[in-house]
Structure formats: structure tokens, C-alpha cells
Amino acid sequence: MSQNVVILGTQWGDEGKGKIVDLLTDKATMVVRYQGGHNAGHTLVIDGEKTVLHLIPSGILRKNVQCVIGNGVVLSPEALMEEMAMLEARHVPVADRLRISKACPLILPFHVALDQARERARGKEAIGTTGRGIGPAYEDKVARRGLRVGDLFDMKRFGEKLKELVDYHNFSLVEYYKADAIDFDTVLKQCEEFAEVLKPMVIDVPALLDKARKNGESIMFEGAQGTLLDIDHGTYPYVTSSNTTAGGVATGAGFGPRYIDYVLGIVKAYTTRVGSGPFPTELDCEVGQHLGEKGHEFGATTGRKRRTGWIDAVAMRRAVQINSISGFCLTKLDVLDGLEELKICIGYQLSDGSVTEHPPLSAEDYEVVEPIYETMPGWQQSTVGITEHKELPPEALAYIARIEALTGVPVDIISTGPDRKETIVLRHPFGQ
């Protein structure tokens, strides 16, 4: 029986989605990215070999899987070429396996320059963007002045539109941010070269997905970042510029919401965050340092050290509400091995002393909440590489059961290490 499955992060990103997508794609015929850009970083470890992907869907390493980049993704041709070259050097035939929407907005050099200039200008108030042009590209899309992949099919018209955009953004770069101007001729030449590579892969994605659905194929939708970074539902303004939630599938891939059968929420056994923004359960102590070191918590995209903290059931419940999550995949359980006790945030105390089980809507209010914790015993046994649920320590099983009780959602998959083999699957999202 065919199943259409969404896999997304339920925290602030970096939950371990790449491994799980790769693990589950043996049951899918198609993997689709529907939002974000190359600001995502999905790390795969297969038979000890590490692969980091930023733009191309994680299913690209599977021989019989077609990978798709939907219209909700802002596409950097330069980043795509680099990633294709890296994969093709390892004998992965990317051009044969990858298809790209004609409606993808393009990230061009002036978007990157603007992103970085703005972050410098903000100083201590910097949002913590990756500086890769994601936000400015989405701005051009919403302002209806952006260039899209489909525009590359008519280079004369493309050049005319590009000249207007270069002039428009150079004014801000030079006059306001005192940065260097972007050279039109250089960008145009690059785009002409990119066009020749991209054209064979460009397709009508909604039609492609609809045909696959009608043929009974199983489709996986791969989310980037996490629910709490969603432009509408995240800790605004410390968010990304796209809809990282399940609703992004309909708008970012052109796939009807009624056709989705299962939503898998990836949640780390603790919490991390990269960059600025509120983080109620953050740990500035030895435990936090331990989690960061043992969990190798450095951003796959930026290399920045991730902030670490206890798991937050309040934030998870919001993710459940927004995404209609069917089941959780709990990752990095093994990182908690050896801790004497664990804490779960079950509520927030507000500045007026009242208690809430719902996250605030503004970052300012989020910054001042105090987490209310429930303490549970840890375990001393190693869980690394365990593949049977019954082999987990009793304390680990109790921890998992408490997460399920607090969120009302079952933990269907448990990850006990970076390799795809180091996993416990209790209920398969594809029903197989």
C-alpha cells in the first residue's frame, strides 16, 4: 500500500532528520524538499562514510529513488553545482536522479551580499542567519520581483530582469550598507552556465507528484530546519524565512494536504539551538557542555557551536498541534547515557508568576519565561547501537514513555547512533 509521509523537525532544527530520511527512503520512490534552501544541513553516515547535504534531498544516495526540489525551496545554482560535483565525484548520478521545479526562486550573489551586510549592520541584534541569501531571496519572491528557475529558459528576458534586480539591490548595498556592488556581467555569465546544467532537470513538480500518487507510489517530503524556526509559528524574529511546518508541503511542493498519510516529527532526546533567540531550557553548566561535546553539536551548515538544553514538552506540544504529528522519532538517545538525572520541561512560569502550558507568541515574552521541570532518573548503561526496544534500560523506557504521555503522541522510532543501522523502528511510517 502506498503512503505519503512528511518528515520534519519539531524543535529548532538539527534534530537528525537526514539520517531518518535516508533510513526510510528504502520504502519510498520519491523524496521531495519543499522549503528552505542550502541553509539546511543534513548529515548522513552510511557504513562509516559521512555525507553532508545542504540542498539536494537526502534520498539522493539511494539508487531507485527520485529526488525533487519543490517550488518552496530557494535555489542557489552555485550551491547546487558544488553539491552535484561532490556527489558525482563519489559516482552518484545526480542529474539522472534529481528534478527541480520551474517555480523555484533563485538565490543570486546580491542576495548573499545583502544577507551578510544586514547581519553586520545589526551588530549585537543580529538574528543569526547563515548568511547564504535565503531571507533576501524570499523577500524578492514575495515582492514579485524575483527570478525563478523557469526564467533561465529565456536568457534575453532573464538578462533584462537581472539588470533591474542588480541595480535595485546595488543601491542598498553601496549607499546604505557601504558594501561592494555586484557586477551584472559576472552574474549573467554565471547564470548562463548554470542554465545549461539545470535545464535537463527542470520539471512541472505538481504534475510529477500527482502522477506518482495516482500510480500508487510512496512519496516522502523532507523538511529542513524545525517547527520552532517557522516564519509564522516560530520564535519570531529569530526564525527562518520559510514555512518549516507540515503546511509547507502543500504550498512548497504543490501536493494536496488530504493526500498526506503520516507526519513524522523528529525530536532530539534533548534540545539544541544555533544562533540567537529564546531557549528556555538552555544549560550553561557542565551538563550542557557534556551534551554538546558528546552529541557533537556543531552546525552542519555553519560549523557554529550549538546551544544545548533539556527537552521541552511545551514546545513539542505546539509542534504536535501545528503539524498534526502522527508519531515521533527520538534521536540521540545515546547522548544521555551516563547522566545521573534527566529533566523534562512540562510548563513555563511567566513574568507575573502565572503558569502556562503554551509557548508565548513573541520572542520578548519567550525570553523571560522560566521552565518548570520534572526530574527523572538517568541510566548508566550504554544505549549505543541498540536495535531492540526491550534491550533499552528501564530508565530510558520510562523517559520515552513520559515524553509520549506529555505530548499525546507515540514514539515510533528511536535512534541510538549516527549510522542508519543504529535504529529501533516500532512502527514504520510507510506501514511496512
Curated annotation (Swiss-Prot):
Binding site for substrate: 300-306
Entry superkingdom: Bacteria
CDD domains listed in its UniProt record: AdSS (cd03108)
Any Gene Ontology biological process: 'de novo' AMP biosynthetic process
GO cellular component: cytoplasm
Residues annotated as binding IMP: 14-17, 39-42, 130, 144, 225, 240, 304
Binding site for Mg(2+): 14, 41
Catalytic residues in the record: 14 (proton acceptor), 42 (proton donor)
Molecular function per GO: adenylosuccinate synthase activity; GTP binding; magnesium ion binding
Family matches, as SMART domains: Adenylsucc_synt
Compartment annotation: Cytoplasm
SUPFAM superfamilies, sorted: P-loop containing nucleoside triphosphate hydrolases
Predominant location category: cytoplasm
Pathway connected to this protein: Purine metabolism; AMP biosynthesis via de novo pathway; AMP from IMP: step 1/2
EC number: 6.3.4.4
Record: residues binding GTP: 13-19, 41-43, 306, 332-334, 415-417
One Pfam family per UniProt: Adenylsucc_synt
Co-factor requirement: Mg(2+)
First-level EC class: ligase
UniProt keyword list: Cytoplasm, GTP-binding, Ligase, Magnesium, Metal-binding, Nucleotide-binding, Purine biosynthesis
Reaction(s) catalysed by this chain's protein: IMP + L-aspartate + GTP = N(6)-(1,2-dicarboxyethyl)-AMP + GDP + phosphate + 2 H(+)
Similarity remark: Belongs to the adenylosuccinate synthetase family.
Subunit composition and interactions: Homodimer.
Protein's recorded name: Adenylosuccinate synthetase
Upper taxonomic lineage: Bacteria, Pseudomonadati, Pseudomonadota, Gammaproteobacteria, Alteromonadales
Gene it is expressed from: purA
